């Protein structure tokens, strides 16, 4: 996936739905995609029929549609985050073990995950912060990070304390090594490649302002 020829800018920071719509727009036609728990699930609401994207959910379904509302809600039809969803024509259901075979076997073009930290080299930390009430095991995110051809991350750029989640080196336990290719935040989209971290788009801030927040060299498409 190539970078844009020039830096794109927007005057306002993005909300959660706007960010999800941006991620949906960037998913290539015909892709097989897994949407992780949390913010990434919103992406399903913005995919178009013309994109012909097939959504996979870890609990055993291909052909997942947008989030269910009103009379669409079926308590037995949920995604991995236990959110009621819809099914599209041709949807299929299968055992959890078969679902993980899809994840581990390289059959997913993209997975979209949340994160606590992403490093300058694309390492992903999204399962444990060391907090006493944190979940005790890594879960399926490890399989997705390893098995998907591309890993997109959706996250806020800063923690509640104002620290950057995009870091030179992750300090939390890793979910995957060198797996993240794009990071979508409310302030910017970052591309992670061999040359470093490139700012593709900014929202409500400048590249110089980003450089004051993120503790690493940031490139732009122009250099």
Model-derived regions, located:
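Glycine-rich phosphate/diphosphate-binding loop of Rossmann-like nucleotide-binding domains
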Residues: 52-54, 66-70
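Short, ordered loop/turn segments at secondary-structure junctions
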Residues: 38-40, 59-61, 116-117
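Conserved phosphate- and dinucleotide-binding cores of soluble alpha/beta proteins
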Residues: 2-18, 69-223
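Short hydrophobic/aromatic-enriched beta-strand-loop microsegments
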Residues: 51-60, 220
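N-terminal glycine-/serine-/threonine-rich phosphate-binding loop
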Residues: 1-32, 41, 45-54
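Short gly/pro/ser/thr-enriched loop/turn and capping motifs at secondary-structure boundaries
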Residues: 60-65, 160-161
